[in-house]
Design a protein with these regions (language model features):
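Short, contiguous alpha-helical
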Residues: 2, 6-21, 26-68, 105-147
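Acidic/histidine-rich alpha-helical segments that form the ligand environment
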Residues: 71-105, 112-119
Length: 147
């Protein structure tokens, strides 16, 4: 039986997160297509920051979108790696039931927070797919048979 947390954070319901974020150039992740409010880079930056704010309890992690597009492709690759490592950390966190029961604020457990991150990630990954479609970069080459 598939682990629920692994399913939520890494593999479930749409292409693997690494595949979904693969094959993009610096130019593509920096584009803000007409009618869109953010670039792919900004969407992932926000999702990674929110994820980190919950996993690491770092309240400042996801406060503001970056003011400029990344200048170097390595910034994009680093952000993807940070996001994927954060998702792995969420899965690891969830493997201990006693940790899930920790109350992080009155009436809110760590399990509640992790569910929130999973839903938040799904929302922003969906926006990234929509942006990729708008700029002609979907499906990723790694998942061309899974649209």
């Amino acid at each position: 039986m598939m682990d629920t947390w692994e399913h939520l954070f890494l593999t479930g319901e749409f292409p693997a997160r690494a595949d979904l974020l693969s094959g993009l150039t610096l130019e593509q992740v920096s584009l803000v297509p007409g009618g869109a409010s953010h670039s792919i880079y900004e969407e992932l930056w926000h999702a990674a920051g929110y994820q980190r704010s919950i996993i690491e309890r770092d309240q400042a992690a996801g406060e503001h979108y970056p003011s400029a597009a990344p200048k170097h492709e390595q910034q994009w690759h680093d952000l993807v790696q940070q996001f994927l490592e954060g998702a792995q950390a969420a899965v690891a966190w969830a493997q201990a039931p006693d940790r899930l029961a920790i109350e992080v604020e009155p009436g809110v457990t760590m399990a509640d927070e992790l569910h929130s991150v999973a839903v938040h990630n799904a929302y922003h990954l969906g926006k990234i797919v929509a942006l990729r479609q708008r700029i002609g970069a979907w499906p990723p080459k790694a998942t061309t048979d899974e649209s």
